[in-house]
Amino acid sequence: MPDNPADDSKPLPTSRILPGPAHLWQYPAHNLIAWQPPGVLDDRLLDEIGEWLCTIEKASAPEKRFVDFSRLTEVAVRTSHLFEFARKRTEQFAGVTAVKSALFSDDWVGFGIARMYESLMKGTPIDARAFRDRVTAAIWLDVPAEVLKLEDKPVPPR
C-alpha cells in the first residue's frame, strides 16, 4: 500500500493510452486501468463499456479498474438496462480471478448509479465499489491518490 495515498508531492505516475474508448489510461506500475468517459452515460455507452471490458479480459489478467464519472454531462441509463448489464457482466466474468472496480462520481445521480451497480455485483468476482472521494478510492485500490486524478499525459500505444 502507498505510504500516504493523499501525498501529491511525488511526480505523476507514467500511464499509457489503451486502444478502446477515449480517455482510457493504463498504469502498469499499479496494475490499474482508469477510464474517464465524457458526455452522456446511456444504454449505448454502458454496452460499449461491457464490450471493451470483455475484450481486455480475454487479452490479459484482470487489472484493478477505476471509472471516473466526473466528466459526464448527463446520466440517461435505464434502470432495467443496468440490471441487464450487471447480469451479463456476472456471466462473462464467471470463473475469472476477482477484480476490484472503483466507480467515482462527485455528482449524486452518477453516484446513485454506481451504488446500484455495486449492490448488483455483490457476491460476484467483480468487487465494485462506489466512491465520492478519490483518496478513499485510492486507499481501497491500493494506489497513490495522485494516480486517480488522471492528470498525467499518457504515452501513446506502441
Residue spans for each PLM region:
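Amphipathic, Lys/Arg-enriched alpha-helical "gate/interface" segment within cytosolic domains
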Residues: 2-158
